[in-house]
Regions:
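A contiguous active-site-proximal alpha/beta segment in oxidoreductase catalytic domains
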Residues: 1-46
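Short amphipathic alpha-helical segments, especially helix-boundary/capping motifs
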Residues: 2-4, 58-63, 170-171
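A short glycine/serine-rich beta->alpha loop
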Residues: 7-13, 69-71, 178
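Low-complexity, compositionally biased segments
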Residues: 25, 96-99, 170-172
Length: 178
């Protein structure tokens, strides 16, 4: 709205937005004559990641710690622009954008490049940014970040440690992991 009222545009690039959650699915959508749903997932094992996942995601922290990304406004600020962009490419105008946030507490000790995560601490997080159209989630960006491939075993995972996945329900339906 600010750009529109000021007669300006906003250009962002990088991984997110910039390829994995927007250009990758939209490129695959170009193969479809109809797109009903799109899910773009980032499924990563952070065991060897040296960045700040404690403050941002709460990994390694106590379960009651509220990390930065647990705030819905922050998730929408960081990833929200991608959701309506994909919706536009699918030919729909979203009614709303929602988010989810889940954490998984490890029952065992987990060793990372940054140290040890003790039992009873968060060792995986899953969050989504969802484009809602006529009461249904039609566009979804999903992130699952874990310490060890066996963490949060009921959550989505890829065939290798780090996966970018696109799942399009349409004509034809497309499933791609990179």
């Amino acid at each position: 709205a600010a750009c529109e009222s000021g007669g300006a545009s906003c250009f962002t690039t990088g991984i997110d937005p910039g390829f994995a959650n927007d250009l990758f699915p939209m490129t695959l959508m170009g193969l479809c004559s109809e797109v009903r749903r799109v899910r773009a997932s980032e499924l990563l094992d952070y065991t060897n990641y040296e960045g700040d996942y404690e403050f941002e995601m709460g990994i390694g922290r106590e379960p009651d710690y509220r990390p930065l990304l647990e705030n819905s406004d922050i998730l929408v600020f960081a990833w929200g622009a991608t959701v309506p962009m994909i919706a536009y490419a699918a030919g729909i105008e979203l009614d709303s954008i929602t988010t989810t946030w889940d954490k998984w507490v490890t029952p065992t000790e987990r060793t990372t490049v940054k140290g040890v995560i003790e039992p009873g601490r968060v060792a995986a997080v899953r969050f989504t940014i969802n484009g809602i159209y006529r009461g249904e989630t039609r566009i979804q960006l999903e992130h699952v970040n874990r310490i060890g491939r066996d963490a949060a075993p009921d959550w989505p995972s890829g065939d290798s440690d780090d996966v970018y996945r696109v799942d399009i329900e349409g004509t034809p339906s497309i499933f791609q992991e990179t």
